[in-house]
């Protein structure tokens, strides 16, 4: 099994959710072709970074996302920051040859999202935008209620 070092940016609610999922991956899905290694958690709040590092077993923590993205040991950048920061982080990650998992939305505009998609394709980078709630029954109910009017 291939080990992939994950650098996770943003230790808030969604960052913690992603951390939990990385830890639970094998129990839920069984043996996979790769094993995610929680390498570094990055958070501007050092106290929160240290707390999440200990809680989920990250090897390191950082408060500088640019240093994390440029770290040659990192294979995947997992972006869980406020939406307006996604573009800058994702663009640098692609330029640095890192694969990306980004919470929705990828960017705040179609134009910049298309730019990142094209750049990732040119560089052979795998990307994924997380729409974690797209299949949530509450969303189907809301859609049905809206459609009834």
Feature names for model-found ranges:
Residues 135-149:
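Oxidoreductase and adenylate-handling cofactor-binding alpha/beta cores
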Residues 59-64:
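Conserved SAM-binding strand-loop segment of SAM-dependent methyltransferases
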Residues 38, 58, 74-77:
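Local beta-strand N-terminus motif with an aromatic residue
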Residues 76, 82-134:
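Beta-strand-loop-alpha-helix segment that lines the small-molecule cofactor/substrate pocket
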Residues 10, 104, 149:
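Conserved G/P- and acidic residue-centered "switch" motifs that form tight phosphate/ATP-binding loops
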Residues 1-56:
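N-terminal Rossmann-like dinucleotide-binding module
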Residues 51-58, 115, 119-120:
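Short, conserved SAM-binding/catalytic segment
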């Amino acid at each position: 099994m291939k080990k992939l070092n994950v650098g996770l940016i943003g230790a808030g609610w969604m960052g913690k959710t992603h951390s939990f999922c990385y830890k639970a991956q094998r129990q839920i899905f069984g043996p996979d072709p790769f094993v995610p290694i929680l390498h570094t958690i990055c958070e501007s709040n050092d106290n929160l970074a240290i707390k999440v590092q200990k809680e989920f077993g990250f090897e390191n923590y950082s408060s500088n996302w640019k240093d994390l993205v440029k770290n040659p040991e990192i294979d995947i950048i997992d972006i869980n920051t406020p939406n307006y920061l996604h573009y800058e982080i994702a663009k640098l990650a692609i330029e640095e040859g890192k694969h990306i998992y980004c919470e929705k939305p990828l960017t705040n505009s179609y134009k910049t999202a298309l730019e990142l998609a094209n750049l990732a394709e040119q560089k052979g980078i795998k990307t994924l935008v997380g729409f974690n709630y797209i299949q949530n029954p509450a969303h189907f109910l809301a859609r049905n209620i809206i459609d009834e009017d």
